[in-house]
Amino acid sequence: MCKLFPAVRLLAVAMLIFLGASCSEDVPGFVVPTPDDNKDNTQTENPKPDDGKDDLTEEPIANLCDEEFLGQKPMIIAYYTENSSALPDPSCLTHINYAHGRFVDKETGDGGIWIEKPELLEKVIALKQQKPSLKVLLMIGGWGDKADGFSMMARDARKRTLFCQSCKEHIDNYGLDGIDIDWEYPTAGPSENGRHPDDTRNFNLVLKELRETIGNTKIISYASSASADYVDWKTAMLYMDYVNVMTYDMGDPPYHNAPLYYSAAITRKRSVDQSITQHFAAGVPLNRQVMGVPFYGHGTDPYKDDVKFNEMAGIFSSSKYEGKNIRKWDSVAKVPYLVDESGNFLLGYDDQESVTYKGQYVVQKNLLGAMFWEYRHDDSQGTLRKALCKAIYGSESTTK
């Protein structure tokens, strides 16, 4: 019996280990290793995910800017770029989106963001002394290489955190009222932007962390394509306050650039109304949509691809365009266009009449407001911005 006992004891220990029982007390002198005692266990506790797969809860709670910090409604938002010379007149504006903020390293989306001509931004923010209700946001991104870095940043947890912290630093340093994100577009856009199939989900991770970082006293807005594709709106709207719908660039000649309503003969894909409706169906309430108005048009020979509104007066007065500058009005689409003597569509654009219809649409549909791209494309008299303001506010000033 005594010679058999060690073997029996070892068998008992083996059975206990197999069954997952701790034998530190049951078998004197033997301790089952725990994870802390395992010298090969080098995993850290709660590592920060880097794949963007488990940062979103299944039932996220809405986290938005407090109402008192959103600014005046209806909104009239001007995009104002670093290429501008004259400062904007804030009298008919409620918000200004200063463009552009860009990634420090656009190839990788790393290093946070930077601003070209920060001294100009400071002058724009100083307009709040003249009009205290004015809100100034920093627009980050844009089309083409201006959007470089978004996809690479959004898929990496460390870069997301750095991006959000950099946004907060700029908000604090300059006294900004928020951030306008112009990622064109998650999962789409030029291939050189590094687009990725997970962009849509990763975008929500960016929004969530940005909200957590800047808090509920600052605005988060997004410049959306005329199409409601690319974004998971039901989740995104839990973190962003409103959407600037870019209801333009919807057609080149012989099609309208930004038709208010669908006109079968000369509307390419969709109208402004269809775009607003599509965003609503996708989960963006009408009272959180800001309708885009282009202060430019699209042309074909003899015109440039892009024609600013402040160039239109010269087009009508110059002999260079004689016989090719005949204004037509599309009574269905509610926009003008130019044709030649044979009736060929040469230039689609917006003018005072069409902008008035669009401002009235904002009021009729109870939208949050209107925005326009861009301030410097208006003429020196402010013809378009004043027409937009008058259609929405009943006067050429937003002062109530």
Feature names for model-found ranges:
Residues 96, 138, 181, 243, ...:
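Conserved, mostly hydrophobic/aromatic
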Residues 105-119, 165, 186-320:
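Substrate-binding surface in catalytic domains of secreted glycosidases
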Residues 66-70, 121-137, 141-142, 203-218, ...:
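Surface-exposed amphipathic alpha-helices with a cationic face
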Residues 168, 172, 180-226, 349-400:
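Active-site and adjacent substrate-binding regions of carbohydrate-active enzymes
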Residues 1-4, 16-70:
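Bacterial Sec-dependent N-terminal signal peptides
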